[in-house]
A protein has these predicted regions:
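Hydrophobic faces of well-ordered beta-strands that scaffold small-molecule active sites
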Residues: 8-12, 31-33, 60-64, 96-98, ...
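Active-site-adjacent beta->alpha loops and helix N-cap segments on the catalytic face
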Residues: 18, 37-57, 76, 100-120, ...
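Glycine-enriched alpha-helix->loop->beta-strand junction motifs that scaffold or abut catalytic
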Residues: 26-31, 56-58, 92-95, 118-122, ...
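Catalytic cores of alpha/beta
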Residues: 18-22, 72-83, 134-146, 184, ...
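Alpha-helix-loop-beta-strand connector modules within alpha/beta enzyme cores
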Residues: 41-68, 108-128, 164-189, 231-254
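Active-site pocket-lining/capping segments in soluble small-molecule metabolic enzymes
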Residues: 103, 183, 202-243
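Active-site mouth loops of central-metabolism enzymes
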Residues: 6-15, 64-82, 125-136
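Histidine/lysine/aspartate-rich catalytic loop segments that bind and position anionic ligands
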Residues: 125-162
Length: 257
């Protein structure tokens, strides 16, 4: 049980207008908007952001990540991040989801400060760069100093169930220090949320709630992968509003008990 009755937060990670609309229909509280979720998400284009804004009324935090892979950024990559923060601020995003590390696995405080300065009044989430940092408890404190309001994390494991011990520790640290909100992500399902509500004080959850859909193409030239040979080019991933609604129902019921 929780000491303070903090409102629950259900954030849905989406990479299409269709998914954004499904998330809203299911009762998500907020969107994390990205492109190419199939590689863990990279920065979305402005066109996608504007269409999502037009078709969907939910608050939007934009994931900013210039490429697949680690969070050690070259000068040019960092310049892209800085420009994207400015662009999405001008376009009216509610927040950005960012993270930069140094070679030794510490949080790159200078780069983070610069991006946060550029963000102005937008809210800041520290993304799963946190899950590959060297000293999570220290980075949690630093995130608080930077004014970051949310940390998206799996507890430094392949999924948040495996990472629950660290997530519990971080949640306790938050109750002592009033630092950033801990948002559990990676492998979140309605059942996982139920387990977390029984065993932790965590109130924020991040999921893609995705279903696989068959491509509408009747004509199919197989054996011509566009990138990742392990993935079918004729499978489409989309948020399922029913899964979002089930997650929301579990949170709502727990909130009224």
């Amino acid at each position: 049980g929780r000491g303070r009755m903090e409102p629950y937060m259900l954030e849905c990670c989406v990479d299409s207008v269709e998914s954004a609309m499904e998330a809203e229909k299911g009762g998500a509280d907020r969107l994390e908007l990205c492109a190419a979720l199939v590689i863990g998400g990279i920065s979305p284009g402005l066109a996608l952001f504007e269409e999502v804004r037009k078709c969907c009324g939910l608050p939007v935090r934009v994931l900013l990540r210039p490429r697949f892979g680690d969070f050690l950024y070259t000068e040019h990559e960092f310049e892209l991040l800085r420009k994207e923060v400015a662009l999405f601020r001008e376009k009216g995003a509610d927040g950005v989801v960012i993270g930069c590390l140094k070679k030794d696995g510490s949080l790159h405080m200078e780069q983070m400060r610069e991006l946060i300065r550029e963000a102005g009044s937008m809210k800041i989430t520290l993304h799963r760069a946190f899950d590959v940092c060297a000293e999570p408890m220290r980075v949690y404190g630093q995130a608080g100093e930077l004014g970051i309001d949310t940390i998206l994390t799996s507890g430094q494991r392949e999924n948040c169930l495996a990472g629950m011990p660290l997530l519990k520790e971080l949640s306790k640290l938050r109750q002592r220090t009033g630092g950033p909100q801990i948002m559990a992500g990676a492998g979140v399902t309605p059942d996982v949320i139920r387990t977390f509500l029984e065993e932790t004080d965590i109130t924020a959850y991040h999921l893609s709630a995705k279903k696989t859909m068959d491509s509408g193409m009747r004509y199919r030239r197989e054996g011509v992968p566009m990138g990742l040979p392990s993935l079918s080019e004729y499978t489409i991933y989309r948020t399922d509003s029913r899964v979002v609604a089930e997650a929301k129902r579990i949170l709502t019921e727990n909130g009224t008990r």
